[in-house]
């Protein structure tokens, strides 16, 4: 009798194991929708994050206000930047540090750097937008495709430009939204593919500091300045109350990786 029970239990266990092996792998992340909470008064953002990670890389709209405390609201149709820090679910806005925006135009030196960067804010449709855990992508109306992902301490940007356009990127260390205020910025061109710097601000924290290193997959020429653009040469450093950058990758390739 004991032998019979042992054999039955063994066959039952083998049967259960076989069933489990035949089951399709269940990907729980397929049920996650990062756009939940980005409309109404949800105050959430749809960008790329990791659990307990130090980077929240997500699109920003060019608006202030209670519904834009996360930087993004689903009712909007303009993206002003992809910045690296965000708050989610809060009723007050802050962060949105180190703003990137791929552009397909050359700089207009007849206007201020701030005005030029604002002129590059891009229209988009939610039909061309996608988000899943750790990943975000969008195609602007001007044809530029952006894909975002993250590691614990690094934001990863992949840009694909129309072949017949400028292949460039603006970096905004100055603009602050809602209750944030920029107090000091610094940028240094280390070499043809590397920048380093910081942004200091006041908001929830009286003295917030974000230090960064930016690496590109292609050589670039850089214009930088607060009130006007000037060439930023290798080894040169600019420190001011604010700074805007225009990074030109030339025409060797229309696919750029930045991190």
Regions found by a protein language model. Name each.
Residues 1-24:
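Bacterial Sec-dependent N-terminal signal peptides
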Residues 23-259:
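Accessory carbohydrate-recognition regions in carbohydrate-active enzymes
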């Amino acid at each position: 009798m004991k032998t019979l029970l042992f054999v039955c239990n063994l066959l039952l266990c083998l049967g259960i194991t076989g069933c489990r092996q035949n089951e399709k792998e269940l990907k729980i992340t397929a049920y996650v929708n990062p756009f939940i909470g980005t409309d109404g008064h949800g105050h959430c953002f749809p960008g790329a994050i990791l659990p307990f990670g130090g980077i929240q890389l997500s699109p920003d709209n060019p608006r202030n206000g209670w519904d834009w405390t996360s930087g993004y609201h689903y009712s909007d149709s303009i993206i002003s930047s992809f910045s690296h820090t965000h708050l989610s679910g809060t009723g007050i806005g802050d962060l949105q540090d180190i703003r990137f925006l791929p552009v397909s135009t050359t700089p207009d030196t007849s206007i201020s750097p701030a005005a030029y960067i604002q002129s590059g804010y891009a229209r988009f449709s939610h039909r061309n937008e996608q988000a899943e855990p750790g990943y975000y992508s969008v195609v602007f109306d001007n044809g530029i495709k952006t894909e975002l992902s993250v590691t614990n301490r690094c934001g990863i940007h992949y840009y694909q430009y129309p072949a017949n356009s400028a292949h460039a990127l603006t970096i905004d260390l100055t603009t602050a939204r809602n209750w944030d205020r920029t107090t000091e910025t610094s940028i240094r061109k280390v070499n043809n593919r590397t920048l380093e710097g910081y942004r200091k601000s006041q908001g929830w924290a009286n003295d917030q500091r974000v230090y960064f290193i930016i690496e590109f997959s292609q050589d670039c020429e850089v214009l930088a300045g607060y009130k006007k653009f000037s060439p930023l040469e290798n080894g040169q450093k600019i420190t001011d109350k604010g700074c805007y950058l225009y990074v030109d990758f030339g025409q060797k390739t229309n696919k750029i990786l930045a991190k």
